Swiss-Prot record:
NCBIfam families for the chain: L31, PRK00528.1
InterPro entries in alphabetical order: Ribosomal_bL28/bL31-like_sf, Ribosomal_bL31, Ribosomal_bL31_A, Ribosomal_bL31_sf
A GO molecular function held by the record: rRNA binding
GO cellular component: ribonucleoprotein complex; ribosome
Assembly: Part of the 50S ribosomal subunit.
Lineage, highest ranks first: Bacteria, Thermotogati, Deinococcota, Deinococci, Deinococcales
Homology family: Belongs to the bacterial ribosomal protein bL31 family. Type A subfamily.
TM regions (residue ranges): none
Protein name in UniProt: Large ribosomal subunit protein bL31
General function of this protein: Binds the 23S rRNA.
GO biological process, one term: translation
Keywords, in A-Z order: Ribonucleoprotein, Ribosomal protein, RNA-binding, rRNA-binding
């Protein structure tokens, strides 16, 4: 086998919004992330109100009964 063909693993800091949130091993000393499980609503239990309508409601609001009448 060849020796020294793999990159060296060094302690790495995972950085989220300018703060170190975790440490691990990597080939890079710092890893900047946009999404982190510690701040995600699913993992924190935090509820966020999302103002979206369902597809059917959006369709009915847009076309109403006119779609059903023309379909006959």
């Amino acid at each position: 086998m060849k020796k020294d063909i793999h990159p060296k693993a060094v302690p790495a800091k995972i950085i989220y919004q300018g703060k170190v949130v975790m440490e691990t091993l990597s080939t890079r000393p710092e890893i900047h992330v946009d999404v982190w499980s510690g701040a995600h609503p699913f993992w924190t239990g935090e509820e966020r109100f999302v103002d979206t309508e369902g597809r059917v409601d959006k369709f009915n609001k847009r076309f109403g009964d006119s779609y059903r009448k023309n379909r006959k």
